[in-house]
Amino acid sequence: MTRAAHSTEPEDLPEAIVIPPASSTPVRAVLLDADGVLQLIGTPWGEALTRGGGPAFAQAMIDGETDALAGRETLTELLERVVKDLGLELRASDLLEMWHRATPDPLAWQLVRDLREAGYTTVLATNQQWERRAWMREQLGYDGLCDIDGYSCTLGVAKPDAAYFQRLLELAGVEADQALFVDDSATNIAAAREVGLRTIHHPADAGGELLRREVAQALTLAASPSRG
């Protein structure tokens, strides 16, 4: 696969924020969101959609995205339908470029590698349409980063549906309380907690240095006998 010129090797790793070994905690799997966590997106989605097609377009895309995220239709099909319904003089192929934006965070990717080295099963837990999944794999180089790829379009269900989390737990071979889920969406975090997962609500685009501290702290707390 062809990769774009995005370096995923950190130039300067923050010193000595140690990841506890998996053997020292009850956590066996770490599930990480992509947008806002492993990759930086800059302009929030709602704002970007509004800029690209107007407020009505943005709302229609948000309201109608479920089937595309669950892989039951393509993003192109959704865009074509919304453009037609709203009578917009825009081309779906041009609008599709809005989904071709994200910059991998080298420090976040290094955290994934360190988690794997420490014995955790790492899971890419991300809502994506078929087209953006292909772009992330081919241009950003996501294949092989995590042990398990949990793209919603391939699973047939998307966050915040409980079935999405249950499917990832099955793939990872762990119980809910053995999994730590990191996401920038409060809705997704609440849904994961309902299923019983441990969670970290990471601020969108806050960067890999903070992410590393959050994950290390959560794993250390999980290892404490006084937890809960």
Segments and roles (model prediction):
Residues 40, 124-126, 201:
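Hydrophobic residues in well-ordered beta-strands that form the structural core
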Residues 93-123, 162:
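Short, acidic loop-to-helix structural element flanking the phosphoryl-transfer center
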Residues 46, 108-113, 189, 212:
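Short amphipathic alpha-helical segments and helix-helix/interface helices
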Residues 72-76:
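A structural motif shared across PLP-dependent enzymes of the aminotransferase-like
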Residues 3-66, 70, 81, 85-88, ...:
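Active-site neighborhood of HAD-like aspartate-dependent phosphohydrolases
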Residues 2-32, 129-228:
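Asp-based, Mg2+/Mn2+-dependent phosphohydrolase catalytic module
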Residues 88-89, 222:
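Membrane-interface interhelical linkers
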